[in-house]
Amino acid sequence: MFWPTKKDLKTAMEVFALFQWALSALVIVTTVIIVNLYLVVFTSYWPVTVLMLTWLAFDWKTPERGGRRFTCVRKWRLWKHYSDYFPLKMVKTKDISPDRNYILVCHPHGLMAHSCFGHFATDTTGFSKTFPGITPYMLTLGAFFWVPFLRDYVMSTGSCSVSRSSMDFLLTQKGTGNMLVVVVGGLAECRYSTPGSTTLFLKKRQGFVRTALKHGVSLIPAYAFGETDLYDQHIFTPGGFVNRFQKWFQKMVHIYPCAFYGRGLTKNSWGLLPYSQPVTTVVGEPLPLPKIENPSEEIVAKYHTLYIDALRKLFDQHKTKFGISETQELVIV
């Protein structure tokens, strides 16, 4: 009889941790829809659905008002298995003071932003010890907060909406020692996520600079070396039918549909799990910005350029440690 070893059980837990987070949105949304349709159509318990929708309306602004984090959820043992799967590692280049607020900008987005979630929406890679006195707020799409239970699960990790009003609230109403974490490349950057890629969708992303200037907070560049190696992606012929559809779809719904794949339940199989590749996120030093409540386009462009320069410097200083050649550069599109 075959008995699984401790290593087998550990691997199984790591795979489960990846699956439960990656599929949580799909499972929760589907369950909520089916259960509520059943309650309304086939039973007399429709008031349950009414109560749920009433609570949703009452609680609607919470993701833009600091969320509702639970430290116990951020410290779940399950997240340790999540980070060990790759594994994930974070490197700090400079201490930061809890007497100020910060916007940490994480690059690249990759296909799933696995490393950013592991470091800043959980505490299993040692964020609280690495940055004592700092409270991270992982900012994500507002759509994650539209569905009951899913919104509560996402908020429990300390995540909030990435809307402008949410950022303004966190930077003015929560005191100091707050770190807003944004992945500015977003879903638009997915199209460039192939193994070895160092291309970032950043030229048109200036809103985070404007917000930082408005509140006079420092920007912190961070680069996750290895994030784009977690999946393969099929690149369709430029100008072909599928490529035109991808661009049309992105224009319509702001999501670029990608044909990506990774490993399956076993290491040598094909599937949608990310490859077990180490990802190291290097957090740079803060770039101080002056407080300008209504910065002009020229001022925003100036500090956007300074931020890109700081990001390039961080990338060039550390790239050879992670298998990137000395001649390979960061490409900004």
From Swiss-Prot:
This is Acyl-CoA wax alcohol acyltransferase 2. Monomer. It comes from the Eukaryota. Belongs to the diacylglycerol acyltransferase family. CDD domains: LPLAT_MGAT-like. Expressed in Mueller cells of the retina (at protein level). Abundant in tissues rich in sebaceous glands such as the preputial gland and eyelid. One of its GO terms (biological process) is wax biosynthetic process. One of its GO terms (cellular component) is endoplasmic reticulum membrane. Keywords: Acyltransferase, Endoplasmic reticulum, Lipid biosynthesis, Lipid metabolism, Membrane, Transferase, Transmembrane, Transmembrane helix. InterPro entries: DAGAT (IPR007130). Pfam families: DAGAT. The keyword Transferase applies. The keyword Acyltransferase applies. 11-cis retinoids act as allosteric modulators of acyl-CoA retinol O-fatty-acyltransferase (ARAT) activity by suppressing esterification of 9-cis, 13-cis, or all-trans retinols concurrently increasing the enzyme specificity toward 11-cis isomer. It catalyses: a long chain fatty alcohol + a fatty acyl-CoA = a wax ester + CoA; all-trans-retinol + an acyl-CoA = an all-trans-retinyl ester + CoA; an acyl-CoA + a 1,2-diacyl-sn-glycerol = a triacyl-sn-glycerol + CoA; 9-cis-retinol + a fatty acyl-CoA = 9-cis-retinyl ester + CoA. PANTHER family: ACYL-COA WAX ALCOHOL ACYLTRANSFERASE 2, DIACYLGLYCEROL O-ACYLTRANSFERASE. GO terms for molecular function: 2-acylglycerol O-acyltransferase activity; diacylglycerol O-acyltransferase activity; long-chain-alcohol O-fatty-acyltransferase activity; retinol O-fatty-acyltransferase activity. Acyltransferase that catalyzes the formation of ester bonds between fatty alcohols and fatty acyl-CoAs to form wax monoesters. Shows a preference for medium chain acyl-CoAs from C12 to C16 in length and fatty alcohols shorter than C20, as the acyl donor and acceptor, respectively. Also possesses fatty acyl-CoA retinol acyltransferase (ARAT) activity that preferentially esterifies 11-cis-retinol, a chromophore precursor of bleached opsin pigments in cone cells. Shows higher catalytic efficiency toward 11-cis-retinol versus 9-cis-retinol, 13- cis-retinol and all-trans-retinol substrates. The chain crosses the membrane at residues 15-35, 38-58, 130-150. It is a multi-pass membrane protein. Its EC number is 2.3.1.75, 2.3.1.76, 2.3.1.20. It is found in: Endoplasmic reticulum membrane.
